[in-house]
Amino acid sequence: MEFFNLIHPEIALGALPTILKGLLITLFVTLLCGIFSLTLGVLVAFGRKSKSRVLRLSLGAYVQVFRSTPFLLQLVYIYFVLPFFGIEIPPLPAGILALTLHYTAYLCEVYRGAIEAVPKGQTDAAKALGMRNRVVMVRVILPQAIRTIIPALCNYMVSLLKDTSLLSVVTVQEMMFRGQIYAAETYDYFTIYTMVFLLYFAVGFPGVKLVDYLENRMKKGYASRSVVTSSEETLTARGEKR
């Protein structure tokens, strides 16, 4: 009961329109950066397997830098340091750029690992049928690779949603920033931050459950495949004995 006594409904209702506008920006940034990083992650993964040594080293350096440094530092560097070199980026584009570069570096490694996990025998078999390298990649390797990493991709998208709150550091008008401003104006930090907390949870929780569901589906799929495979091997062994 003491918890609810600390919440002021009139302040919550007054703050709701402002915070919901911030939520729309949060969702917009998440969607846009998700599309960019998912797409660029594939391209960077292919680039890291390129025959060009310069391209491989350049992309490898980019991935190592962005995976080895905190996202907040990357964001601050893009917004506050690049102007010293004559590159001034407004808050929202700077936030989108930082998130995209950060998550592309991680997603490309997810893609690369999944591509390399596809058995080489399938690639050889496809080439033996006369398929070109590009066709093999699109029709044989990618469908199998992407299917196995869907839970991981969804998990990264949930993390991306949560990391949008850090854009408040560079004054992006997302949900966290608007909550901070309203809390500072009303001095009711408990009510405002509880609202922001609940809204983040309401948006992020379905994503977390989706990841759990997909992981369970993948486990069941692998289990059923292993049962079928073992049954086929048993039948084959019996046939050979006869």
Please tell me what each predicted stretch does.
Residues 1-242:
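Transmembrane alpha-helices and adjacent helix-loop boundaries
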